[in-house]
Amino acid sequence: MNQQLIECFKALGDPIRFSIYNSLKKQRLCACEFTEVLELDISQPTLSFHLRKLKECGLIDETRDGNRKIMSINEAMLNQMKIYWER
């Protein structure tokens, strides 16, 4: 198995990161919207930590819209994960 896939599966093993990723399947979100949308009781630094972990392994992409950081699913990585599970 590819090391990047291993890191992705490990990242999704955390309940908070899994919730973040799952919410992005439905819509793109600004980093500032996660705690409200997910109703998470976590601090901004903790949220940033989890978003960074998801970005580092390639599960999510970040784009800028002015001062806002917009997060979305990395479709290429999602497809790699699907291909792995369909083998």
Range-by-range predicted roles:
Residues 1-5, 22-26, 75-87:
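Amphipathic alpha-helical dimerization/coiled-coil segments
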Residues 55-65, 72:
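Beta-hairpin "wing" of winged helix-turn-helix
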Residues 50-52:
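Short, hydrophobic-biased segments on the C-terminal half of alpha helices
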Residues 1-9, 14-21, 54, 59:
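A generic structural signal for ordered secondary structure
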